[in-house]
Amino acid sequence: MRILVVEDDQALGAQIAGALVKSGYIVESALDGEQGHYLGDTSGFDAVVLDLGLPGMNGIEVLRKWRDNGRTMPVLILTAHDLWSEKVTGFDAGGDDYLAKPFHMAELLARVRALIRRSAGRADPVLVSGAIKLDTRNGSVTLHGVPVVLTAFEQRLLQFLMHRAGQVLGRTEIIEHIYAQDLDRDSNTVEVFVRRLRVKLGSDSIETIRGQGYRMARG
């Protein structure tokens, strides 16, 4: 899962990004509205954390431009002012949730998880595919009720496949969602991680669609 953080306070932005990375997300950051708008408009993200008080282009303008351009990723708005009028403006511009500063990082993480679940049409934080269960709140995985230990990349790949269960996901799309920009994006590594997951979760846990990509079963 890829998250964009647009926050001009470098210290706070680093804290948010660090907490998201520890939770298993791939994070990209922007310090001003123009950079944030560009990243959100040209790259695929599963959710955005967007501050309103940005230099260059304020958060409301950034959000409106995204929505005008057909960008539908869920957006969590951050602001230093807990004003009802500002909330209304943010929601009218296309925001999905709202969090006033200061806030507890655990609440921000919970709201991001909820946004991603809602955007995927799910209310349950536990993803299920056959005998496999993945709890998105803590990243734990079980097979027939028995805990399975996964590496960070294995967990990211599994969560992405399970979030999009029933859909065929190509290598390029998978790479964009589970690898940070500064890492080697060799598509052959996707095959390596798929093989590892099959060893741990069963040979039929992930289906290969010849010439297209991979798919996990729903429910």
Show where each model-derived region lies.
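N-terminal/domain-start alpha-helical segments
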Residues: 1-119
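Structural detector for helix-capping/boundary residues
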Residues: 43, 52, 106, 130-132, ...
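Short strand-coil-strand connectors
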Residues: 8, 128-130, 137, 144-146
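The C-terminal output helix
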Residues: 114-127, 166
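A short, compositionally biased
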Residues: 121-122, 134-140
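Positively charged, aromatic-enriched patches within helix-turn-helix-type DNA-binding elements
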Residues: 140-205, 210-212, 218
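Short acidic-rich active-site patches of cyclic nucleotide enzymes
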Residues: 96, 212-213
